[in-house]
């Protein structure tokens, strides 16, 4: 063991669950010096010595039935964590969340670091999408990934001071002196914004010619949000490009440390502001996993129905704007009219439209209203006819096909290497849909197909989105036909807010209700995460509780952060016009990327 490595506790007993078989494979290959952490999850969390982490990661990448995807990578400041009995000593912990499609299982690898030595080898030579994840961990925690090709800030400006997800970094504006802007500070910030190609890893030219550099964004209609792409051009050809993100960053993971488990729910709506209730799902289910709450069947089906309504709304907007960016102006206006019908249902059920924040820990905010089924029936009768019109008039249009066929194309191997999930992965022929692979909230009881395309181009991505609308309608029809009776919220002391009907009957229930609503519930110490298929791909909330009313660490893995990172590998060598089509068909919302 290297001098800077941190000793492991004694090995833990073998777990017989299938997902834990990989632990024995690791021990066979590397010996017994691993520590398997107990969590609330159905897959192993294994602590590894820093000196062996690259070997272990490479083994997992190449093992039989390999862990082909680096699903997430981040860190945690453990210095103020109280309830970590038995865990290896660690000031900062770096973790790698890996996914195996063949095993249909995950593994989390953890590495303990001492505050005085925050160096760890890069994983970019194993998974290319480690690039942005490591830059984010450097930006937020100050972790130094040795061998990284361009370790610089990614979400914050280069002149930013400090690392915001460290515990000494204040979370409230009231803890800072008032912000003052003067000419010297303005000049300093502007100078740091000066474009220097070498800072971005770009060459100014070659022996024969100079390249032109062009900023697409940060305010460009085809960027679908505030972000910039620095283009290195030779005429119309894109020689190289570098996405520049962070314009929407608002520190949502830091906010989670100062909100109660319940009061953080509205923030989840706004990670992907088009996802609505679907964005609540991974968070509340992770909290329920942590608390051991079993959600009633009626609440599960209601959640599924709301999820699919927001999936339809997202996909209608996606298809309309994709066609618009390819030159077809009319369909997007019709699709916006259809989206209003969905929003009418959402508003009737939740009281709000885009940001309902309606799911609760243990169920939903309230029951379905009277005559809810009438609006749903109208949508189910209306949408199939409209979809037929869109398919005939727009998606079979020769101009649209010409602009999207064989454009911005990538294969399944590339998609997995870059961590692509959702429709972008299914457009390459891989049928990974969390609702099917790992059913949750009763999805195993629904009959629906997973649409696939195989070309991996822009047209394939549009068609997968479009066909998924039909499948969502099928699921909603089954919700309508088979809505269970019963409660809409779990009768559990940690469900929030707790049932109010008994508060007038005995003082103990009244006190519990008061504490839960005012201070928030105290969740058991431990770790939990939950993966769901949100509207843009697979999303996970990884929660660490230190037995408090607030989360100690909330890690939000969003799908589009890694989708956007794939851009140079797809677009380099193409035309600028192809970049526009690419951006139109990867379904990116910048709030989801930047968090």
Swiss-Prot record:
Q: What is this protein called?
A: NADH-quinone oxidoreductase subunit C/D
- PANTHER family listed in its UniProt record: NADH-QUINONE OXIDOREDUCTASE SUBUNIT C_D (PTHR11993:SF45), NADH-UBIQUINONE OXIDOREDUCTASE 49 KDA SUBUNIT (PTHR11993)
The family note in this entry says: In the N-terminal section; belongs to the complex I 30 kDa subunit family. In the C-terminal section; belongs to the complex I 49 kDa subunit family.
Q: Which organism is it from?
A: Acinetobacter baylyi (strain ATCC 33305 / BD413 / ADP1)
Q: Which keywords does this Swiss-Prot/TrEMBL entry list?
A: Cell inner membrane, Cell membrane, Membrane, Multifunctional enzyme, NAD, Quinone, Translocase, Transport, Ubiquinone
Tell me the name of the encoding gene: nuoC
Q: What class of enzyme is it?
A: translocase
State its location(s): Cell inner membrane
Q: Which GO terms describe its cellular component?
A: NADH dehydrogenase complex; plasma membrane
Q: What is its main location?
A: membrane
Q: How does it sit in the membrane?
A: Peripheral membrane protein
- Which SUPFAM superfamilies did the record assign? HydB/Nqo4-like, Nqo5-like
What is the protein's quaternary organization?
NDH-1 is composed of 13 different subunits. Subunits NuoB, CD, E, F, and G constitute the peripheral sector of the complex.
